Amino acid sequence: MPAATDLANAWFAKRGWKPFAFQRRVWAAVERGESGLLHASTGAGKTYAVWLAALRAFKPRPQGRHLAPIQVLWVTPMRALAADTARALQAPLDELQLPWSVGVRSGDTNSAERARQARRLPSVLITTPESLTLLLTRAKAREDFATLQLVVVDEWHELLGNKRGVQLQLALARLRHWHPGLPTWGLSATLGNLQHARDVLLPQGGLLVQGRQDKALQVDTLLPKAIERFPWAGHMGLKMLDQVCHEIDASASSLVFTNTRAQAEIWYQALLEARPDWAGLIALHHASLARDTRDWVERSLKQGSLKAVICTSSLDLGVDFLPVERVLQIGSAKGIARLMQRAGRSGHAPGRRSRVTLVPTHSLELVEAAAARQALLAGHIEARFSPRLCMDVLVQHLVSMALGSGFRPEQLLAEVRSTWAFRQLRDSQWQWALDFVCHGGSSLTAYPDYQRVERQADGVYRVTSERLARRHRMGIGTIVSDANLQLKYWSKGGGGKTLGSVEEAFIARLRPGDTLVFAGRVLELVRVENMTAYVRRSTARKAAVARWNGGRMPLSSELADALVEQLDAAAHERFEGPEMRAVRPLLALQAQWSALPTTSTLLAETFKSRQGWHLFLYPFAGRMANLGLANLIAWRVSRAQPLSVSIAVNDYGFELLSPAQVDWASHLPQALGTADLLEDVLASLNAGEMALRRFREIAQIAGLVFGGYPAAQKSTRQIQASSGLFYEVFRKHDAGNLLLGQARDEVLSEELEIERLHRQLLKMSELQLDLQALRRPGPLAFALLVEGMRETLSTEKLADRIARMVAELEQAANAG
């Protein structure tokens, strides 16, 4: 075995590699016991920078009959990454014959492995934030982690901006309490605010190491054979099917990314119908497929035996697929960081080029494609910010820490305040959380199930009920979704193969005998019982495609700004790049019939139709912020003039349709102020209903609502009813309940993007209003008209109506 200081160099030399400067810097920092955040492009060698640093610093030696106890804790955001990471970490241990073991602990870990880990944790444990918290609830958790020397948080950018990251901050605070100064390293890519990312992970300070960012990245676009001058969203992009087939054919192995699981299912079916000879050579991958199916797809990708995989964000992160030569993105990626992340799935190794090809689903996405490439070259990457003062996560953490050995309030308070998320936690907030887990707050004191934590005679707070402890452990985590039904093949004797899971709301719309598309198969629904939908294969040609909530992502601010810059250039007759030259006829028509948005103007259009008077406004603020702006402006104008409006939005702008004419030239400038923004936004929307929806998630995280045991899961309707009851009880009898306030704050920050709304209003008020009266809707307005009709027409009627409108508008455009 080489000397410890030569371990890394020896292993690199064995593979014909030379360490990069950033890798050497990390090695030296870990040897000094320092912490840090390593930021480098995908596939640049971050994993081995930190892993080989650990081997050099901690000098593995034989420990008698046993392999070394736990030395390194490796936290990953996805269970799918754990096995892949384990293989990557095991390789140098095997080749250098080092006496360390590597183990995985996640929701997929079998009972035999869990039992082994209960006796002794492996030298290196790869786990998720949820499983780490579960390990910390054990009575001997401190003893289990007594030999821990290093924590590594992989893909930190994926955890930073959500409650899973907050949960991890609290877990790390517990480990740091046991091991003051515990070295911690975060690994990150595609992030625009590195200082904040480092400060959240390392509140005591640490290094910021910038890795190689010069990885070759090629971004190109498949240009449609014909440019539609009247585009509309909602296409699956299947007009590009032949061209996508040609691109897949030209590469040994490709990933085809879609933004939704339903779109992935549709594209998989379409590709197989277009190329039956690809059966067995292409595959489908998304989070709702059965684990063994996803494992098979990932193994086959690694082995290079698949021509293409149609996938969603389930393959966004760090799984290492060396054979993948290129990535195709169907539709807009909606953000620069997401596009970079997906591009990095190809050429996933130092020195190799990554290539992503954008496949527009409608003509305006050509402008987005040009904007995305320009923003990538300029390095404009989205920032992510940690949530603050998540009281539901704190309540869950208090109960978790009361399990096992329990906690003393003063010591745990110091721990909690050492995290970035709770550094400003007030004494009153802490006392409320403590009272809530002990007594259920001021409104649940009569119910024993909500008196989860008890103060013992020795001053230690513990959970004494085994039943409540078991329920709590099953609910640990912050990932909340609608109840899912297992999808299984029907077998009279039971025990049919599991295909995956679908949302209860989708299955509720089907009756036995109806057909659906799932996992690339056409299936017939047989029956539904005990949260399981039983199906059999079907030969039907048409079927409903399984749908999941959460499919529409808003356009990021960075991509939206880059998009407006491209339109500004077009307004000044500059059409750079193949995408902008291709879409020039559409933009020329927009300029002829109206005007193009620019960086110095705010385009607004008015139009009279049989439906009424239309206002189209284009802030380019993303779907959610545009929805907030539309409601805000309609409400503010209605105070001066009684107004009944219907609203349609997309990422570029919104439509207000009213039965009466409105003097927008005088009303709009007044409606764009930021004064009283919070009050006006809350008044303009059904904020109570939105807060109730958000409270359902908060109630589950805080442990108020139990989702049921594995064999007896509660339905979405049951969970909604329970959380709705709590919401009303708190609203009427416990108005100071901090979970209610949190629900409102989350609606404002996450659903209405109040900060973005504020910034957008400031920006809009500084722009010159360009109000155009239209004789007929132009390309930008047409996209919004279709969004409005989508709410009132069936799919077939909508398609017919759009076809007639396009024919009429094309005739007018051709007539000049």
Curated annotation (Swiss-Prot):
Gene3D superfamilies: P-loop containing nucleotide triphosphate hydrolases. It comes from the Bacteria. A motif (DEAH box) lies at residues 154-157. Keywords: ATP-binding, DNA damage, DNA repair, DNA-binding, Helicase, Hydrolase, Isomerase, Nucleotide-binding. Pfam families: DEAD, DEAD_assoc, Helicase_C, WH_Lhr. Residues 403-480 are annotated as: WH domain. ssDNA-stimulated ATPase is most active with Mg(2+) or Ca(2+); Mn(2+), Co(2+), Ni(2+) and Zn(2+) stimulate at low concentrations only. Residues 240-402 form the Helicase C-terminal domain. One of its GO terms (molecular function) is ATP hydrolysis activity. Its cofactor is Mg(2+). It catalyses: Couples ATP hydrolysis with the unwinding of duplex DNA by translocating in the 3'-5' direction; ATP + H2O = ADP + phosphate + H(+). It is an enzyme of class 5 (isomerase). Residues 27-193 form the Helicase ATP-binding domain. The record marks 497 as: Wedges between bases of the loading strand. Residues 481-816 are annotated as: Domain 4. InterPro entries: ATP-dep_Helicase, DEAD/DEAH_assoc, DEAD/DEAH_box_helicase_dom, DEXH_lig_assoc, Helicase_ATP-bd, Helicase_C-like, Lhr-like_ATP-dep_RNA_helic_prd, Lhr_WH_dom. ATP binds at residues 23, 46-47, 154-155, 328, 345, 348. Its EC number is 5.6.2.-, 5.6.2.4. PANTHER family: ATP-DEPENDENT HELICASE LHR-RELATED-RELATED, LARGE ATP-DEPENDENT HELICASE-RELATED PROTEIN. Part of a locus with an MPE ssDNA endonuclease, a putative exonuclease and DNA ligase, which suggests the locus may play a role in a DNA repair pathway. Composed of 2 helicase domains, a winged-helix (WH) domain, and Lhr-specific domain 4. Belongs to the Lhr helicase family. Lhr-Core subfamily. A single strand (ss)DNA-dependent (d)ATPase probably involved in DNA repair, translocates 3'-to-5' on ssDNA, unwinding any encountered duplex nucleic acid. Unwinds 3'-tailed duplexes; both RNA:DNA hybrids and double-stranded (ds)DNA with a 3'-ssDNA loading strand are unwound, substrates where the helicase loads on a 3'-ssRNA tail (DNA:RNA and RNA:RNA) are not unwound. This is ATP-dependent helicase Lhr-Core.
